[in-house]
């Protein structure tokens, strides 16, 4: 094993949050070496899985993300046009866009940032990180995809931007023969069309009323209207549809309410007074699971379904093994500071997080608590807490 690489920080993950952290660290630590660890360096899950998804973020906010720190602006100004940035400027700024535009923007920023001599790029996964508390130093072990050797990096700061994946719950009816559809597949029309058989009647159970659930319904309805005329959908939901509302200078249900294409589809076709008469209503049967009716509803309706897709949120991806002075460490995230504490409530030195796995907790003027997920929301959070991380 070669000698450990010494750096000012280690950033794990190269999705939108990891990229934002790298940009902020390069801006605030000029001349310092920053280690960046990721298996792909291809803009994370948003690029791998969600390129065909319509965003619930306005184009102008993607632009604000891309110009938020000087290292990003330098990349934009030195990238030959046409490029992902110039393409973004031609879109309608006050509307959403398909996420492939945002993913390509992140890939272009990543490509430019990786050219910096101040970035130590390591293509692989972190397997273990141990804090030497008296030295305030993390020793980070990395399984490199580019060499057979384990790589080690030593740094006073370890920032986890490790992402999340769709939540999987147990099938509500035991021993039921039903095929799971991955939410990521249902959100990708080009893949969904191949995932469901066309030659016989098929019924897909969609669980949830989130933004992802509504987009899943939209994609399945589009399929039923075109290539899969025998497809039907049973929509299991406990909650009324909830929409983001633009208030005076802020957004009610900014992180939990429907926006954009999903909101338009829901308002026009899925509301209780619209569904029976709408185009979507030709294919969708809504199953009310509210007020304790959930178990009975599943038992009555799920056995007639051939497939099930659960759109019930996202679960943090597994973290690398963490230790302090060789002893296993259980880390609890602080959604205010971006730091972590141990099982006894003690602050863990130099350990931080951001992104969908570790979002900021926000409270709106009506005292509603939400967790801020989105490109520019990650950037705002990181810009707020990064000075504190570097001063600690």
Swiss-Prot record:
InterPro entries: Agnestin_monoxygenase (IPR053275), FAD/NAD-bd_sf (IPR036188). Disruption phenotype: Does not affect the production of agnestins. One of its GO terms (molecular function) is oxidoreductase activity. Residues 1-20 form the signal peptide. It is an enzyme of class 1 (oxidoreductase). This is Monooxygenase AgnR1. The gene is AgnR1. Glycans are attached at residue 134. Keywords: Glycoprotein, Oxidoreductase, Signal. It comes from the Eukaryota. PANTHER family: FAD_NAD(P)-BINDING DOMAIN-CONTAINING PROTEIN (PTHR38688:SF1), PYR_REDOX_2 DOMAIN-CONTAINING PROTEIN (PTHR38688). Its EC number is 1.-.-.-. Monooxygenase; part of the gene cluster that mediates the biosynthesis of agnestins, dihydroxy-xanthone metabolites. The pathway begins with the assembly and cyclization of atrochrysone thioester by the non-reducing polyketide synthase Agnpks1. The atrochrysone carboxyl ACP thioesterase AgnL7 then breaks the thioester bond and releases the atrochrysone carboxylic acid as the first enzyme-free intermediate.
